[in-house]
Amino acid sequence: MPSKKETLTVIVIMALFLLLTAACIGLRSEHLLMAALYLVLFFAGLPTRKLAVALLPFAIFGISYDWMRICPNYEVNPIDVAGLYNLEKSLFGVMDNGVLVTPCEYFAVHHWAVADVFAGIFYLCWVPVPILFGLCLYFKKERKTYLRFALVFLFVNLIGFAGYYIHPAAPPWYAINYGFEPILNTPGNVAGLGRFDEIFGVTIFDSIYGRNANVFAAVPSLHAAYMVVALVYAIIGKCRWYVIALFSVIMAGIWGTAIYSCHHYIIDVLLGISCALLGWLFFEYGLMKIRGFRNFFDRYYQYIK
């Protein structure tokens, strides 16, 4: 059983989480499910308690994303629609029937069923694969590498979320469907990924993007960032060559899909890649060189190892 201090800490934090969530954005069934699952893991026994604590970076990531509903980024800074579109066209524009268009506009008109299928498969990997990779590291007892990966994953997300507030930006599908005037409370849009749903007669992407917390959060593309982090730690962790090759293919596929499906400009993708590399470098060569943070990391590792 956990100590009295641990028990009290977890119960108080969980109660605060549920109360704040209910007050600020409203409780949903997944909040209660997540809280119940965490408490079961924490109190079931020592192995599951270690897992519950190890998963905290991913839990904080999910909570942080959800809580962005409290204060939409467009209430902090103006939304960029035309500026990003025009910059994309000037840097990466392509000619289509004598007209200069963005790559996303080109693919909105020119698309292929095979590409739509692969696009859907790649985009379904962008969160599950990094999380499954982290769990593999954890259960293979490579917990120091796991913890570094999990904390960098969280750190990259926090950098990306900060970017959303610094420069709110509309995705390509918004400019295509709505023009250049920001319309607040615009619902999420499945964009080109809807073709995957249509091919298979499902609503996978419609259910995901219909509940998007904020559509004006295209810069940087965190879709482009996650597999970069996974690939970096697959290399650091000396994973087998076929794992590294698979991660490389998935990473490149997600980058291409982001553009092909009109969810991100090339600029967004490049900034997402930069965000991932910046987060990794700052964590490994900045934070880990600070004694206080290193001590925190070591205590965390000792708890979950």
From Swiss-Prot:
Effect of a null allele: Phosphatidylinositol dihydroceramide (PI-DHC) is absent. Levels of inositol phosphoceramide (IPC) are severely reduced and ceramide levels are increased. Results in a mild growth defect. Abnormal RNA level of genes involved in carbohydrate degradation. Does not appear to affect production of outer membrane vesicles (OMVs) or OMV cargo selection.
Topology in membrane: Multi-pass membrane protein
GO CC aspect terms: membrane
Signal peptide: 1-23
UniProt entry keywords in alphabetical sequence: Lipid metabolism, Lipoprotein, Membrane, Palmitate, Signal, Sphingolipid metabolism, Transferase, Transmembrane, Transmembrane helix
Reactions catalysed, as given in the entry: N-(2-hydroxy-fatty acyl)-dihydroceramide + a 1,2-diacyl-sn-glycero-3-phospho-(1D-myo-inositol) = inositol-1-phospho-N-(2-hydroxy-fatty acyl)-dihydroceramide + a 1,2-diacyl-sn-glycerol
Lipidation, N-palmitoyl cysteine type: C24
Cross-referenced PROSITE patterns: PROKAR_LIPOPROTEIN (PS51257)
Broad class of where this protein is predominantly found: membrane
Pfam entry (one): PAP2_3
InterPro entries per record: Aur1/Ipt1 (IPR026841), IPC_Synthase-Related (IPR052185)
Bilayer-spanning residue ranges: 41-61, 117-137, 149-169, 216-236, 241-261, 266-286
S-diacylglycerol cysteine: lipidated positions: C24
One MF term in the entry's GO annotations: inositol phosphorylceramide synthase activity
Record GO biological process: sphingolipid metabolic process
Compartments, as annotated in UniProt: Membrane
Function noted in UniProt: Catalyzes the addition of a phosphorylinositol group onto dihydroceramide to form phosphoinositol dihydroceramide (PI-DHC), an essential step in sphingolipid biosynthesis.
Protein name (database record): Phosphoinositol dihydroceramide synthase
